[in-house]
């Protein structure tokens, strides 16, 4: 088992839209559909979220999120998630960190909270990104990494199994 693990690529797993349901939580917090929320001004969009200092730490699991985490957890995955700029929402980084400590018990040295554009910097031939945002996947692949565009847990697990997991 240990030998096999060394040869498998490192898994980087996104949070929002993969493990936790940001959209559902944002709809609950703002009272508008995610489609409508997307078209609001920056302050209308983020105001109610910023006002709730527990927003990030109390996001619900994504449907299939626990199942996916249970599958990948034995491979010592890293979290690679984007944060909202600290000046804009100072609760984001500590809130996401708390969510991870509470829900997945991932060690701090495997938590990478970065600007969205920095995700591609983690790419190499021995790394996989699981992400629900296609641009992150294409940027990661351009840098030589393996990308799994997350549309469902069953599909992502199928893709991981094809890679030898």
Where are these regions (language model features)?
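Active-site neighborhood of HAD-like aspartate-dependent phosphohydrolases
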Residues: 5-53, 142, 152
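A general structural motif
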Residues: 6-8, 74-76, 108, 124-126
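Short hydrophobic segments within beta-strands
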Residues: 14, 80-82, 130
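Short catalytic/ligand-binding loop motif for oxyanion handling, primarily in non-cytosolic enzymes
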Residues: 20-23, 28, 77-79, 86-90, ...
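Substrate-recognition element of Asp-dependent hydrolases with the DxDx(T/V) motif
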Residues: 56-61, 65-96, 100
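Donor nucleotide-activated moiety binding/catalytic core segment of transferases
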Residues: 97, 104-129, 133-137
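Acidic, Mg2+-coordinating phosphoryl-transfer loop and its flanking beta/alpha structural elements
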Residues: 124-162
């Amino acid at each position: 088992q240990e030998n096999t693990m060394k040869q498998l690529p490192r898994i980087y797993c996104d949070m929002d839209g993969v493990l936790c349901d940001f959209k559902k939580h944002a709809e609950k917090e703002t009272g508008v559909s995610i489609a409508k929320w997307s078209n609001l001004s920056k302050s209308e969009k983020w105001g109610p979220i910023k006002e709730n200092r527990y927003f990030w730490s109390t996001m619900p699991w994504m449907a299939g999120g626990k199942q996916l985490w249970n599958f990948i957890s034995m491979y010592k995955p890293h979290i690679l998630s984007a944060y909202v700029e600290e000046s804009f929402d100072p609760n984001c980084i500590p809130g996401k960190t708390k969510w991870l400590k509470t829900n997945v018990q991932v060690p701090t040295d495997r938590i990478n909270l970065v600007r969205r554009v920095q995700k591609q910097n983690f790419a190499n031939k021995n790394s996989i990104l699981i992400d629900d945002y296609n641009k992150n996947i294409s940027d990661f692949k351009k840098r030589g990494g393996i990308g799994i565009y997350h549309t469902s847990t069953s599909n992502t697990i199928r893709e991981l199994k094809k890679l030898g997991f």
